[in-house]
């Protein structure tokens, strides 16, 4: 059974043997206390994903016009996926989900095209657009995911 939180998922899987520890409860309380901001961030990302993507790619085209011209549809697809997975990861407060579900695969694909540097720039620009378009508290929740994308691409 999947829940909205990885800690709870893990504990439910082992419910016959373990109660939640004080530390687990503190983490769940922190999760619950921040949930309204997480939902707000998820909704904003969902509702503005296309605009965030387009604005980010326009900025990228200023630095890498040939790449964007040749790979526009692929760039849109990849960036849309990153936004979608980041929004769900923010909602779940689950960086591991983001890394396992998307980043390892994406880094390998981008590396095969030999455009990791350019794509890392794209995700830096994406975060700058998010910083402009979302309230600061929401943009701050997205930042670890854009940083993870940048690091995964540069280290691929």
Which functions belong to the PLM regions below?
Residues 129:
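Helix-loop "lid/cap" segments that line or gate small-molecule binding pockets
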Residues 1-104, 108-120, 124, 132-156:
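Core of compact, soluble alpha-helical bundle domains
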